[in-house]
């Protein structure tokens, strides 16, 4: 659902592009380390270390503007978040492939379900879900100011991806708010 006006979204995009501590992302595929085209930064309540795709990210303490937005999203979603992985795709040639956010550090000891709230800014992009066991696929066009919430069994049964598009020349930024359990990281 759209939670921000076009004007609010444009202001957030401009501010976050200029003020977040963007760094190239790294992943390990088949034992080889790659630097991706997209940029990322991870913020949180503490200086957590988050491991995914064979690499480690060190959380920075919350940027004040990001923290205020987190509090707003927590009220909308009805779920607490203690971290945010921010992703920057500078144009449509930058994407993220099929994956699930199912790391043990994202699941509480009491339940297996992961809750991720993802807020988009900038270019409208195609975001897809693909069922892990069935031939089922869902395509969404994510607009600036739009929030989607992945919860329940989403990460267990579905993979998701941001698709490439050579026609898109504008940036897309998305903020993925998560609850991170540092003691459960393996």
Where are the regions a protein language model picked out?
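Non-heme Fe(II) oxygenase metal-center motifs and adjacent flexible, charged/small-residue loops
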Residues: 1-186
């Amino acid at each position: 659902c759209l939670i921000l006006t076009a004007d609010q979204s444009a202001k957030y995009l401009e501010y976050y592009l200029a003020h977040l501590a963007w760094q190239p992302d790294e992943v390990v595929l088949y034992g080889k380390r790659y630097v991706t085209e997209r940029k990322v930064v991870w913020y949180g309540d503490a200086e957590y270390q988050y491991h995914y795709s064979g690499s480690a990210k060190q959380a920075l303490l919350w940027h004040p503007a990001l923290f205020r937005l987190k509090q707003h999203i927590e009220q909308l979603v009805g779920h607490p978040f203690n971290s945010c992985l921010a992703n920057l795709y500078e144009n449509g040639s930058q994407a993220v492939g099929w994956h699930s956010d199912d790391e043990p550090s994202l699941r509480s000891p009491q339940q297996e379900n992961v809750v991720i709230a993802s807020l988009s800014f900038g270019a409208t992009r195609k975001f897809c879900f693909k069922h892990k066991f069935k031939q089922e696929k869902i395509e969404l066009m994510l607009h600036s100011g739009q929030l989607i919430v992945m919860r329940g069994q989403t990460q267990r049964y579905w993979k998701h991806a941001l698709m490439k598009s050579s026609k898109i020349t504008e940036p897309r930024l998305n903020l993925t708010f998560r609850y991170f359990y540092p003691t459960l990281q393996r």
